[in-house]
């Protein structure tokens, strides 16, 4: 009996160690448009190809990777249609994509870092949509006195959206100083030349 117990404990310990040096990503795409899903690791100045797998007929896919520490990854159809994960050893990440694009509506569980990255990305996307809408309205105004008042209102609203994004990112960084996801909050951009945290004042 003791020998059996020792064997069982050993098996669980080995399995536990094996699980802690790898992570899995299991996903389901409700409307798969392409055959393959690509996984890249994000490094400072480049993407490193990790794997590409075929999406099954029911829209499911699964990756299993060796990992020694948390890292950012891009998963999606291409370099322009993807989402970002922050995967750590031992995690069992589950994903659901609801649209035609992997960069669209999705859910992720089983990874606190990836859930936080999703929150940051969705908040930025919503902020950028508001800013784009304000730019469009602003550009369509005519140059009369009434439009001058409207311009001022739109400029104030534009500034308010930027300040709110900046405030939320700072709050996340301050409350999650040990999370690698805080790096995402630091380096998010409104456009190619403007960081969310940049304040011109």
Where are these regions (language model features)?
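Alpha-helical repeat scaffolds
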Residues: 199-201
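A short structural micro-motif
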Residues: 14, 161, 189-192
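Sec-dependent bacterial lipoprotein signal peptides
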Residues: 1-15
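Amphipathic alpha-helical repeat scaffolds of TPR domains
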Residues: 178-192
